[in-house]
Amino acid sequence: MKKVIVTSTWGAGYPEGGGMQWLNLHYLAGLQALGFEAFWLDLLGAPKKGSKHSLDEMVDVFRAQCEQFGLGEHWAVVYDNRKTFGMTEHLLQSLCGDAVLLINLCGALKDNDLLRRFQNRAYFDLDPGFTQIWAHEWDMGLSQHNLFFTVGLNVGQPDFSIPVRGIEWQTFLPPIALEYWPAQSAACAANFTTIGQWRGQYAVWQDEMYGPKSDEFLRFVGLPQKTTQPIELALLIHETETDDLAALRGNGWRLVNPHQAASGRDGFRSYVQQSRAEFSVAKHGYVKTRSGWLSDRTVCYLASGRPVLVQDTGLGRHLSTGEGLLTFTTLEEAARGIESINADYASHSVAARKLAEQNLAAPKVLQSILERAGVR
């Protein structure tokens, strides 16, 4: 059985981040469904000062999650580039040499000794726009890879605003393991919701700033004033962001802590499935570059039969929008999108699930990636 390794830097170190856990698990499930031996390699840095979790706790939670998901012993954690959990260093080196493909999410694996052992090393860009800007500024390890994939469906196209420096980025949609995300009844679903971080990375290209999600949310801060539909944001936003918190609450946004409302893999799934629909902006950098980005969180809503209303990143060139998946560019369009979903919720719900089944099913997405990587 052919082996494929999927990497991360968030598996063990961020147990509260259920969405990040699901991100990797969807790739792994898709590979397993296609008959591959799938391994999860997590690169864990030294815990930050004041961390709530000890090293042993983080590894134990990660181990239990892998076992619950059916990975058995197909996992490893490399701590601070030195200590290995889950398998010996020698076994990990041997596995890297045997694997037919490395799926290196966000370039998580940087160890050249391990990288050079792989037959095929695929860099997976999950931050389109930012990645291409940063590649102009410093060594991101792209040269250590021979394959390049991005969730930015417009990357490299004429309307994508950042030069790609000769890299042949191949595009793909975020995969989802549909068997773990059955369509849900809308009987108890009241709120439009989303889950995410308020702040994030910035990048500068030709003296112009490309910013995080907060920049875009503040453009649409008045939306709750234009609808009777409750909108709840499970956002990591620091208590010192007093002006932003006041603006959000003052305009009627409901705010909850994602580490309480949607913590861990099961908590994240429950929160998504108990929502009526998703409403979310995108990071300013995704919008400004016209990246064609679709969130790996959004696909969880779609698979659950939850319609989504998300900010336009140029996605409509590649996916049909208007039923189940709706996009907006202005405050007025966002308000109309909410009205449209609520006016015919059942149809939008069915369309959301259908879109996921037809375009996002993990085996289908991974099969296309593997074929383009030359892996059969």
Which residues does each predicted region cover?
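Conserved catalytic-core segment of nucleotide-activated headgroup transferases in glycan assembly
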Residues: 156-277, 285
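Short, polar loop motifs at secondary-structure junctions
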Residues: 106-111, 151-155, 236-242, 311-315
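Catalytic binding pocket for nucleotide-activated donors in carbohydrate/polymer assembly enzymes
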Residues: 14, 19-20, 25-26, 32-47, ...
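Residues at the C-termini of beta-strands that transition into short coil/loop
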Residues: 79, 125, 152, 173, ...
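Short, structured coil segments at secondary-structure junctions
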Residues: 117-118, 144, 165, 251, ...
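Hydrophobic anchor at the start of a short beta-strand
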Residues: 36-38, 121, 192, 230-231, ...
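Extended catalytic core of nucleotide-activated donor transferases of GT-like folds
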Residues: 6-159, 262-267, 271, 287-289
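Extreme N-terminal starter segment of soluble prokaryotic enzymes
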Residues: 1-5
